[in-house]
Amino acid sequence: MKCSLRVWFLSVAFLLVFIMSLLFTYSHHSMATLPYLDSGALDGTHRVKLVPGYAGLQRLSKERLSGKSCACRRCMGDAGASDWFDSHFDGNISPVWTRENMDLPPDVQRWWMMLQPQFKSHNTNEVLEKLFQIVPGENPYRFRDPHQCRRCAVVGNSGNLRGSGYGQDVDGHNFIMRMNQAPTVGFEQDVGSRTTHHFMYPESAKNLPANVSFVLVPFKALDLLWIASALSTGQIRFTYAPVKSFLRVDKEKVQIYNPAFFKYIHDRWTEHHGRYPSTGMLVLFFALHVCDEVNVYGFGADSRGNWHHYWENNRYAGEFRKTGVHDADFEVHIIDMLAKASKIEVYGGN
């Protein structure tokens, strides 16, 4: 009996010691390792501090899911808006001929050399090597900022610009692209006064202000020799027609249109309608590949169905449709398709 009582007392004592030990350990652990239970840790600062990080992750996730490559409402190169456009568009082809893409594929070389055949052949690469000692030979559009929206106006030469009043709207774009003669003085209210890019070939070339990029559209190796000459010695004065022996343009802003891009338009877009695409189409697709948003002015006939230039008084000149080189009707069809695909907006003029 005495032994049983002794065992019972010892058991109770050990149990009480064990319980007290647990209580002490829990209390000490709570104070030492759970600071978020401290009243100071429950203020609004800590709760608010967590929210922006999570919200930021949500915004980043939405941006990634949207897949947009620019800050415009719609971005030109982003797929999904039109199956027709996506099946034709190739964003990997540079519209600018540079040191990096100087070597043309054989099929492109043959096609380009036959656009305006010359009696005397020239080594294209050697000509380009010399030319790129005078002009940059770089692609200024290689890097695009996804946080910006590059808006471009492609301004054609149609008579439908007369009386349109588009001038201020045109001048509001980042890039304003014109072609060939395209006078602005005296027509500012309708065509605008600013120009950032002017596309010409030797036979249509004119002097440009220092802040304008001259984009040469070459149809033959002689055109490359001409621009090198026009910016240096002035020796070349004739191709198949008289050309300017000297040209006043900013050498640092001279760009050369890529024949491979030229053929890409002919193959993919105009689908061999006409011998080759018109200058207007070349400029339009240049814009489609370097811009985020493209608005088109001065293309097609006027409201009476006449084809003429906006600076011509003869409304019935219709030179564009009489050349036999370009298929005007098919090019109008392509422009209409691009507009329906929401890739461009066309301003029909007067």
Swiss-Prot record:
Residues at which substrate binds: 116, 157, 180, 240, 276, 280, 300, 309, 326
Coiled coil feature spans: none
PTM: The soluble form derives from the membrane form by proteolytic processing.
InterPro entries in UniProt: Beta-gal_alpha2-3_sialyltrans, Glyco_trans_29, GT29-like_sf, Sialyl_trans
First-listed, main subcellular location of the protein, grouped into a coarse class: Golgi
Compartment(s) of residence: Golgi apparatus, Golgi stack membrane; Secreted
Annotated GO biological process: ganglioside biosynthetic process via lactosylceramide; globoside biosynthetic process via lactosylceramide; protein glycosylation; sialylation
UniProt GO MF annotations: beta-D-galactosyl-(1->3)-N-acetyl-beta-D-galactosaminide alpha-2,3- sialyltransferase; beta-galactoside (CMP) alpha-2,3-sialyltransferase activity; protein homodimerization activity
Keywords noted in UniProt: Disulfide bond, Glycoprotein, Glycosyltransferase, Golgi apparatus, Lipid metabolism, Membrane, Secreted, Signal-anchor, Transferase, Transmembrane, Transmembrane helix
Membrane topology note: Single-pass type II membrane protein
Record's keyword annotation contains Repeat: no
Cytoplasmic topological domain residue ranges: 1-6
Glycosylation sites: 211
Protein name: CMP-N-acetylneuraminate-beta-galactosamide-alpha-2,3-sialyltransferase 2
Organism per entry: Pan troglodytes
